[in-house]
């Protein structure tokens, strides 16, 4: 168990009048299953890219884990998933990868087929299996339910509930409710952390919005 510490994070795109983040500070445990919430265009993808070191920023992000993004780009789609795993982790243990696929209700035979021939749902399961056997990793999981039917979403939810250490971005609120135990939410140019799932966060937000509305009404009188 360790902490990911974000201190005074400030970032804005060149030419933009407003910063995406302004002195954002918070910490999260590397064992948490975090849902990342915010309206489209508010900075979710930007923050993931900052964790991945893709942009320069002011402030600090300190962590003892390696951030891994899903879905990661496969350089040669004609490679098999087994070859993809070997290129990333030359010394990985085959039984561990097979175990992950079984937990996702996926045929381990997928490992021997060209990646380009797999369905999008099969690709999702293969890539997640590879990432979750990497040592000392904290996953940044971006919309994993795309291309999955209801049954596969349920299987994936149960799978992720058994894991620790990730940030999950998903527009599927029921999926978030099932999986996460903490919420990261973007509030203007800051990020706040709360224990609970999406419903817990929404209830708290509704209370805060109602309180703010009442205060504004009092000021008008």
Description of each model-found segment:
Residues 1-216:
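ABC ATP-binding cassette signature C-motif
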Residues 218-221:
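Short cytosolic helices in intracellular loops of multi-pass membrane proteins
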